[in-house]
């Protein structure tokens, strides 16, 4: 394939414009007091063992029947005997503009200014479930013991506070 000088310069111009715009979006997203936590789940390495779910449950004292994160198995891919599955992590995405924070009538759902983590203050939560209805990822739940909203908080009150990584990592 040969490119004319005009096609090349047009392509470079488009690339520069797109790169500049993408950089501004990333910079805006990452600028919460200089810190922004994020979770990357490498689906190519996940075998679906759910050890991450068990570790989360143990460290954060989440009872059986509910979970702060879920590993979802895909439909089978391929034909027997060469069937493969893919595994996906489903947990809080800590949205930039979190609908759960916007709808909370008591301010229990909030974004931590120091880390950017969207969290729930159980002392303020009245269990109205507005945040559960507003969550586009359907990852919040009512904790069966405390009767308050709960979700992934990157182990903010447990492992992160002790200088460790989240339990699921």
Residue ranges and their predicted role:
Residues 1-16:
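N-terminal secretory signal peptides and thylakoid transit peptides that target proteins
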Residues 20-52:
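C-terminal segment of N-terminal export signals and the immediately downstream linker at the start
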Residues 23-29, 51-73, 97-124, 130-147, ...:
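Iron-sulfur cluster-binding cysteine motifs and their immediate structural context
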Residues 35-39, 88, 116:
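Short amphipathic alpha-helical segments
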Residues 70-99:
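Mid-chain, structured segments of secreted extracytoplasmic proteins
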Residues 153:
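Cys/His-clustered metal-coordination modules, chiefly Zn-binding fingers
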């Amino acid at each position: 394939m040969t490119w004319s000088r005009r096609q090349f310069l047009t392509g470079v111009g488009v690339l520069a414009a797109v790169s500049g715009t993408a950089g501004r979006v990333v910079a805006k997203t990452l600028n919460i007091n200089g810190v922004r936590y994020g979770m990357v789940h490498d689906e190519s390495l996940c075998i679906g063992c759910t050890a991450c779910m068990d570790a989360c449950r143990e460290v954060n004292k989440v009872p059986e029947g509910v979970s702060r994160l879920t590993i979802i198995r895909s439909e089978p891919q391929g034909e027997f005997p060469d069937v493969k599955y893919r595994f996906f992590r489903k947990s809080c995405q800590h949205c930039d503009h979190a609908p759960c924070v916007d709808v909370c009538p008591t301010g229990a759902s909030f974004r931590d200014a120091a880390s950017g983590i969207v969290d729930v203050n159980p002392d303020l939560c009245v269990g109205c479930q507005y945040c559960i209805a507003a969550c586009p990822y359907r990852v919040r739940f009512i904790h069966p013991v405390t009767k308050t909203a709960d979700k992934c908080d990157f182990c903010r009150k447990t492992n992160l506070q002790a200088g460790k990584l989240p339990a699921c990592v």
